[in-house]
Amino acid sequence: MLGILNKVFDPTKRTISKYEKKANEIEALAQDFEKLSDEALRNKTIEFKEKLEKGQSVDDLLVEAFATVREASRRVTGMFPFKVQLMGGIALHEGNISEMKTGEGKTLTSTMPVYLNALSGKGVHIVTVNEYLASRDAEEMGKIFEFLGLTVGLNLNSLDKDEKREAYAADITYSTNNELGFDYLRDNMVLYKEQMVQRPLHYAVIDEVDSILIDEARTPLIISGQAAKSTKLYVQANAFVRTLKIEDDFTYDIKTKSVQLTESGMTKAEKAFGIENLFDVKHVALNHHIAQALKAHVAMQKDVDYVVEEGQVVIVDSFTGRLMKGRRYSEGLHQAIEAKEGLEVQNESMTLATITFQNYFRMYEKLSGMTGTAKTEEEEFRNIYNMQVVTIPTNQPVVRDDRPDLIYRTMEGKFKAVAEDVAQRYMTGQPVLVGTVAVETSELISKLLKNKGIPHQVLNAKNHEREAQIIEEAGQKGAVTIATNMAGRGTDIKLGEGVKELGGLAVIGTERHESRRIDNQLRGRSGRQGDPGITQFYLSMEDELMRRFGAERTMAMLDRFGMDDTTPIQSKMVSKAVESSQKRVEGNNFDSRKQLLQYDDVLRQQREVIYKQRFEVIDSDNLKSIVINMIQSSIERAVGSYTPKEELPEEWKLDGLVELINTNYLDEGAISVKDIYGKEADEITSFIMDRIKEKYDAKEETYGDEQMREFEKVIVLRAVDSKWMDHIDAMDQLRQGIHLRAYAQTNPLREYQMEGFAMFEHMVASIEDDVAKYVLKSEIQNNLEREEVVQGQTTAHQPQEGDEEKTVKKKPVRKVVDIGRNSPCHCGSGKKYKNCHGKTE
């Protein structure tokens, strides 16, 4: 009964039926469009754009637009999309995943929805896994779009900023997923709006979508710089702070744990370090180091706040008294304590910006993708990306022979059998593709084939250009190719002359992958577009996946039957057990990716807030009101900490507040206790703000409107960038240590969300305090440049194009862009990075 209901109400069938009707409408226009001249066909683009301007939607134009691309493709490339390709294109336009078997023409399928969505002028991104495929598709398919009057861009790692901006400004941009992610991060580190390269993210079509959104989902893209200041400054600040005396040179409030230099302390600092004004923008880093050294000596107590164990500073949880191993204080405080205790000062975090593919691609207004294998991950695509997987029928029925698994006792027996099978097929001239899970297996089989004197090619996904060439030739008579399962994706294996008669391409799998999807990809290499082919997996009881579900019992059974190492078994029971083991592993992997996303969502929300505000800063002509509001918040906090509601006004430490305000915001003697005595807390805030506004207006009068506006931007950008980078580091440390605090009845994710939110609020307050302090106390230099602000920052800044992406071998894998010290600086100053952004104070 259930089976009948499923057939009647199967949503996939309904979707396919709907797409088929639409495809019939497109096909019905074929003859009319064939009669159009080239110019008339080109003019369709102008006509469609006009219709969109008049209020029609892209959905209204679908049938005609698809018919236009179909005819243009026939004229330009000689390829005429089949009906199933039209259906695949409709699925892509609707923001779904088209599951189309290998060889069904996914690349051509994408041209139709890409053209339709590019008509709005907002830009469409076609995403591939490597630059070779991006270049190839831009070259081959780009001709169709250019014939129809649209512009095509190719975004490569080697391009400079102007070339990248041009590539993104095109109607259609081909790029790799890595480059898109890194460009997004770089755009949110620029100092001028004009330096940005990407437009708002509109629509993306991802080729090999399962590889990018699932296999690489847990890979964070990280832009990192070399530590822009040496650890020497911590040691110097530590030595200086040891010479200071409490009350004379600094004040300490035990309740708020805040330590402040007095005027005398500042004078000593300026003398000790040979500078004129400690609050000058140039000396931001020095000021920060002194403040942290003071805090380390005065506010942080050994064996109370931290302990020293095996040469490491370990934080003590103030609530539980437990040691929080793996956690470090942020903003350089940990390094300051290390200097205080005479330990080796560790380098600070160098992460400048980070995002995962999951969160990058979820920012697009509309997202779609193509692959030959997505159905097994349908739930993940639906839950995380809100995309449905639509299995598109093949143009020709699949006649490939998928044979049952052959299972051997040992790996040695299995590999010998594989080599023997390859040798027999080689003798007949049938091409063979041997798929392996690991590079070591490829090398082992290569050795066995060499011993048998069989010529072959080994592929290990290092050289994309060469890889595609080898894969293309893998269908020729007598070809033997050994490849890791993922190698050569996106390149078809076309059968050579006379190969069909030999049974087509033989695909041999040397073990089952933990994901059924990867096994299906390997099978899909054979039998494209109705071609013949066979697939055969060889397994052994020693394979990792087999060991997972209790191969010992089966081994004992084989021993009882007296089976030797040369005889395989074909058992449905074992094959089913393998599949259920794969399903379990897939489920576990999905759960871990889902959990990662829940943790990553905390940082995503914070990143969106910071990047949005940062853009508003570089986009704004006048930040005065924003800066005044920041100062107001900072003053309210300062006043609040000295005028607690639970104390009587007579108990308020107003002398401490006056010292703080005069030192950090106004000038010595600007306000006195007498000025604020007897006032309510909000009256004190208003009084101080009036004095601050007077100082602000006087400063504006002195320097002029234009210079003051640029000065505000410099100060705000410096504060936002340095505090955000510290915050990324702190969140990373919190994330790594949070599971250690999963005490009874505690949900670590909830703890991470709550603590992460508190840390974000603290960061915002810290930004406001920094802006208030430096806007009021720094002097403006005549040749003020935004780039100079970064020299005083706590970390390095933006990478250059052409930098290496390196993968750090940690779990999860991280794709990192490093900044070379001799690279030209991103800011356009013409200086080397080490003499500009990477300059050490």
From Swiss-Prot:
Any one GO MF annotation of this record: ATP binding
GO annotation (BP), single: protein import
Named cofactor requirement(s): Zn(2+)
InterPro entries: Helicase_ATP-bd, Helicase_C-like, P-loop_NTPase, SEC_C_motif, SecA, SecA_CS, SecA_DEAD, SecA_motor_DEAD
Positions of region (Disordered): 788-841
EC number: 7.4.2.8
SUPFAM superfamilies membership: Helical scaffold and wing domains of SecA, P-loop containing nucleoside triphosphate hydrolases, Pre-protein crosslinking domain of SecA
Residues that, per the record, bind ATP: 85, 103-107, 492
Cofactor note: May bind 1 zinc ion per subunit.
Chain positions recorded as Zn(2+) binding sites: 825, 827, 836-837
Reactions that this protein is recorded to catalyse: ATP + H2O + cellular proteinSide 1 = ADP + phosphate + cellular proteinSide 2
Keyword Amino-acid biosynthesis belongs to the record: no
CDD domains linked to this entry: DEXDc_SecA (cd17928), SF2_C_secA (cd18803)
Cell compartment(s), UniProt: Cell membrane; Cytoplasm
Function: Part of the Sec protein translocase complex. Interacts with the SecYEG preprotein conducting channel. Has a central role in coupling the hydrolysis of ATP to the transfer of proteins into and across the cell membrane, serving as an ATP-driven molecular motor driving the stepwise translocation of polypeptide chains across the membrane.
Subunit: Monomer and homodimer. Part of the essential Sec protein translocation apparatus which comprises SecA, SecYEG and auxiliary proteins SecDF. Other proteins may also be involved.
Family named by the database record: Belongs to the SecA family.
Protein name, as recorded: Protein translocase subunit SecA
Taxonomic source organism: Bacillus pumilus (strain SAFR-032)
